[in-house]
From Swiss-Prot:
Organism from which the protein derives: Clostridium botulinum (strain Hall / ATCC 3502 / NCTC 13319 / Type A)
Subunit comment: Homodimer.
GO biological process: L-histidine biosynthetic process; methionine biosynthetic process; purine nucleotide biosynthetic process; tetrahydrofolate interconversion
Pfam families attached to this UniProt entry: THF_DHG_CYH, THF_DHG_CYH_C
EC number: 1.5.1.5, 3.5.4.9
Keywords per UniProt: Amino-acid biosynthesis, Histidine biosynthesis, Hydrolase, Methionine biosynthesis, Multifunctional enzyme, NADP, One-carbon metabolism, Oxidoreductase, Purine biosynthesis
Protein name stated in the entry: Bifunctional protein FolD
Chain positions recorded as NADP(+) binding sites: 165-167, 190, 231
Gene Ontology MF terms: methenyltetrahydrofolate cyclohydrolase activity; methylenetetrahydrofolate dehydrogenase (NADP+) activity
């Protein structure tokens, strides 16, 4: 039976520290504030937005939601971004992805002020990570993976890590982050041949495919540490990850659950970044 790596325990510890820091900011009449930009009305985006707002309210972090039409002109979006960048009361800016196809992703990401880029979307902030500098904002999901491993005293040094994702949201930045911790990294993707033969040799497997219960027990060895980043809906309408949790947990060394795993830490780190930004700009 695997050790279950609960993310909500990690999140709770981070929030305890945030409460103290937010109280100190209040003494200076500073209230941390996040601007959320959502284009369109996709149910997943609305649900995510509500969860962020709820989490912010619990810590007395203010939010400002900009609900935008999916067909918004790029120039109008950039004008709004410029306004938010210049608004002193706004400490962090989060733009929901993916963007409508008519918008240039690089231009949108580059329009976010570097000091308000709380999910590390700006190319210059990402470049810093690729250069091995982990001192500023990091993408929240990859950072959540690192924080959970750190909380449970799982040392990355010398470990063989397989990441099943090659996106700029998870796979690529995470690969650079674990490299900075002296791990050896393999990135796999949809074109990888014989994926189980690769993952089975790994010490740590991180999966972010987005396919419910696709990853079965034959992908792992008895000592595997499994980090399931995805949040999917299974055949019964329940939340699940990429990994067939109930079967795999009997065969590996440790595993994150879904829910109460990586996702809970991801949102908490977003809150931490907002507070970080408020402190830096105070």
């Amino acid at each position: 039976m695997a050790k279950i790596l609960y993310g909500n325990e990690v999140a709770l510890k981070i929030k305890e520290d945030l409460n103290l820091r937010i109280d100190k900011l209040k003494e200076k009449n500073i209230i941390p504030k996040l601007a959320i930009l959502r284009m369109g009305n996709k149910p997943d985006d609305i649900a995510y937005e509500r969860s962020i707002i709820k989490s912010c309210e619990k810590l007395n972090i203010e939010t400002k939601v900009e609900e935008l039409n999916e067909d918004i002109l790029e120039e109008d979006f950039l004008k709004l971004m410029e306004s938010l960048n210049n608004e002193k009361e706004i400490h962090g800016i989060l733009v929901f992805r993916p963007y409508p196809k008519h918008l240039n992703e690089n231009i949108i990401n580059s329009s976010i002020a570097l000091n308000k880029d709380v999910d590390c979307m700006h190319p210059l902030n990402l470049e810093r990570i690729f250069e091995g500098d982990l001192n500023g904002f990091m993408p929240c999901t990859p950072e959540a993976v690192i924080e959970i491993l750190k909380y449970y005293d799982i040392d990355l040094k010398g470990k063989n890590i397989v990441i099943i994702n090659r996106s700029m949201v998870v796979g690529k930045p995470l690969s650079m982050m674990v490299l900075s911790h002296n791990a050896t990294v393999t990135i796999c993707h949809s074109r990888t041949i014989d994926l189980p033969s690769i993952t089975k040799k790994a010490d740590i497997v991180v999966t972010a495919i987005g396919k419910a219960k696709l990853i079965k027990e034959e992908y792992f060895n008895e000592d595997s540490i499994v980090m399931d980043v995805s949040i999917n809906i299974d055949e019964n309408g329940k939340l699940c990850g990429d990994v067939d949790f109930e079967n795999v947990k009997e065969k590996v060394g440790a595993i994150t659950p879904v829910p109460k795993g990586v996702g809970s830490v991801t949102t908490t780190l977003l809150l931490k970044h907002i507070v970080d930004a408020a402190e830096r700009n105070s």
